[in-house]
Amino acid sequence: MSIRRPDPRYPGGETPLDEDPLASAFWIRGFRREDASAVREVVFGVLAEFGLAPDHADTDVDLSDVEIHYLVPGGGFWVVEDGRGRIVGTCGLWLDPDDPARCELRKMYLLPDWRGRGLGGQLLEAALAHARSTGRTRVELETNRAMTAAIGLYESRGFREIEGETCARCDRLFALDLK
């Protein structure tokens, strides 16, 4: 028997416990329209955890319609779903319509209890594979210096910090040239 403890950071109010096979099971799959609300909860919850504010008018407008901003142009958007059907992670790949070589990794977030399980690396690999399949040769991403674990993941996969403009809540820009 497992005991649940309330956790406001986790949609549904429950924290997954390793002793509960349904709570600790997961899979990565493509975004579905019915995921939209849960995706926003994950993204905005993680932003709040790091003291960062959502920007519904600019940086986060893409979450108003994931299909239009990511899927229709040929990009991708993935979610991590736990064994109970709850969304616990997100990752998007936006294709730059003005530069056929360039794309952006966006909205890569995992709820706290799901970090450190290799899921970030799996999400990143899914996005990079998709970028390659579309013929893109450069992946860029913006992040915030407070997200040290994410930065470590990006650097371990070959991303390097570059100069350039970032959105208001981000202060670091990285790029990876695909082979």
PLM features: residue spans?
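C-terminal "cap" of GNAT-fold acetyltransferases
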Residues: 2, 9-10, 26, 45, ...
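The identity of the second residue at the extreme N-terminus of proteins
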Residues: 2-3, 18
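Short, intrinsically disordered low-complexity segments
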Residues: 3-4, 8, 28, 83, ...
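Intrinsic-disorder-associated, low-complexity terminal segments enriched in Asp/Asn/His/Tyr and depleted
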Residues: 7-10, 20
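Acetyl-CoA-dependent GNAT
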Residues: 17, 21-22, 26, 30-106, ...
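Conserved glycine-rich acetyl-CoA-binding loop
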Residues: 86, 108-125, 132-134, 138-139, ...
